[in-house]
Amino acid sequence: MGDESNTLRVLVATDCHLGYMEKDEIRRFDSFEAFEEICSLAEQNKVDFVLLGGDLFHENKPSRSTLVKTIEILRRYCLNDQPVKFQVVSDQTINFPNRFGQVNYEDPNFNVGLPVFTIHGNHDDPAGVDNLSAIDILSACNLVNYFGKMDLGGSGVGEIAVYPVLVKKGTTFVALYGLGNIRDERLNRMFQTPHAVQWMRPETQDGMSVSDWFNILVLHQNRIKTNPKSAINEHFLPRFLDFIVWGHEHECLIDPQEVPGMGFHITQPGSSVATSLIDGEAKPKHVLLLEIKGNQYRPTKIPLRSVRPFHYAEVVLKDEVDVDPNDQASVLEHLDKIVRNLIKKSSQPTASRPETKLPLIRIKVDYSGFSTINPQRFGQKYVGKVANPQDILIFSKSAKKRQTTGVGNIDDSEKLRPEELNQQTIEALVAENNLKMEILPVDDLDIALHDFVSKDDKMAFYACLQRNLEETRTKLNSEADKFKIEEEDIIVKVGECMQERVKERSLRSKEDSRFTSSSQNLDTGGRSVTAQSNLNSFSDDEDTREMLLGARTTNAGRKASGFTRPSKDATDVAKTGTSRRGRGRGTASMKQTTLNFSQSRSSAAIRSEEVQSSSDEENETNEANEVVESSEPEESPQQTGRKRAAPRGGRGRGRGATAKRGRKADISSIQSMLMSKDDDDDDEDDRPKKPPPRVTRNYGAVRRR
């Protein structure tokens, strides 16, 4: 564009997914090589700063190796003596809400020659008690400028205010808006709720008008979806924007496209490393060099040379003439031929790839009318020839059955997110057990399980337990001050506490449904198949948080404690009093379970910090059994000869006669968790010493045979 002093040069990239496949011997360095090339291109083109659109890391808690490699790359390319030729003229304490509150190159203790601005994505989003992400680590090291981190407040679905980072270079003024990833369903409702999303415009000063600013928005959300409630429509965005960088979608659509009737252009750089082997990922990878002067911009796409070659093909066996349905050897020979041709094609060096790498090969096979073959066995012959010998083939049925649902072009469902089925099965398994719990809601356990597995939060279950115990203790103590609670009423009161929490969730779910109704009315026929929403979008392959938690509700109005997670949705619950999912299932779907007696005794022992010998523990167990035996006379003598139901069969049927006979034992187990140490000692003295013959009972029913 000429006149370099007034031209702002920005290198745009998204979805680097650093650390992806870090345990794979062949592909472990792919993400780092691509990211280093991006930084190298920024240095070669002498850009003013690098703009990243989220998902810098693949894992929410990246490994030490990943963090070290990332810091090494940023330190190598960002810390130098090159002068920074632009200024940030906005309130930096608002733009960068960390302890230091300023852009990194203005720190006198660091020589930052290449500033990096980034938002968070759905993979590296803030989580935990302090609402921190892995990007906060890089920000604390003064290596990146982390912006677009929203504090969801207000009532209902929440409220956010998007403040721009105001950048000035000569006569060019750029307002850089950042919006880190927010759950799509929630952000969708927020855009349709008046005044829920406030866009702050630059103030008029020094003879400048608002129209003098070139407005850029970078966000990380679903874009192409059939179900409009699980994505963000471009028409939700304000018309004053000039240019939008769309992250999260992995298909490279680097050329800016104008949105009809909106007046702005959208670029979708896509990912720099293939994380899901689908057709969209097979397109060449690029980054965008954006040059801005005044209110004009010039885009230049730059191909990435370090990306591992990836070739994708689709085969319909019934359409192949030389394949016999009754001869598996002919099927193998035909597929071998296709794989060999793709390997040969990828082995030829090109201008964009001077060095050849082992390629990624994926063949989608429509095996309608044929029998499948073992993909692992098929790939053994290609070890050392391709980078993914274990999953070259993926089998699918004919799409005719899918087309009968009224939705065409349904492909790649099993490949976009191959782990969805397993996670849904785990969630369903917890619900199917129908275990009657007295204190812990199943929804809380689902969330704790997700955080433990996906977020590597080792304290997830402990925090869940402590939070619910604290709520139950608080409720019992408040009622004990007003009314005298007898020993026999404790278990009833515990159940009432549980039901009250369930009822609160239900009420907030109904309240939240009011915000959903507007979005349902706007749905104009694109929601015939919900599964289609995962197919038309080439977004990252592990967007599991929305799936697992999409239909769940959380404890609304929980008392804040040291283990409460104020991350995105959890913060919303504490501040807005609404459910974090907005589609709570109410009390009808709440499943609870009975506390395991032995676990309850162990929890009581840990809480009271008593050190007991093994003989004392054995005596306590015997006394517990004796309480059960002493409760037998509550039944009429005519029932002594009646056959008892097996422990398995009694599960999930309410209390009945069995619960009545074991009532005092349940009281003792729960009282040991909720009451003080002194009360436990008094109960031990009051228990009978010589009970009738012992009867074996099952108190937990947590094992399914």
Swiss-Prot record:
Top-rank taxon, per record: Eukaryota
UniProt keyword annotation of DNA repair present: yes
Give the Basic and acidic residues compositional bias ranges.
505-514
Kindly state what the record says about how the cofactor is bound: Binds 2 manganese ions per subunit.
Pfam families registered for this protein in UniProt: Metallophos, Mre11_DNA_bind
- The UniProt record gives the binding positions of Mn(2+) 2 as 55, 122, 220, 248
Q: What is its main location?
A: nucleus
Q: Which cofactor does it need?
A: Mn(2+)
Quote the biased-composition stretches of kind Basic residues, using this chain's numbering.
641-663
TM region(s), chain numbering = none
GO MF annotation list? 3'-5'-DNA exonuclease activity; manganese ion binding; single-stranded DNA endodeoxyribonuclease activity
Record family assignment: Belongs to the MRE11/RAD32 family.
Full protein name: Double-strand break repair protein MRE11
Q: Which organism is it from?
A: Oryza sativa subsp. indica (Rice)
Name the lineage: Eukaryota, Viridiplantae, Streptophyta, Embryophyta, Tracheophyta
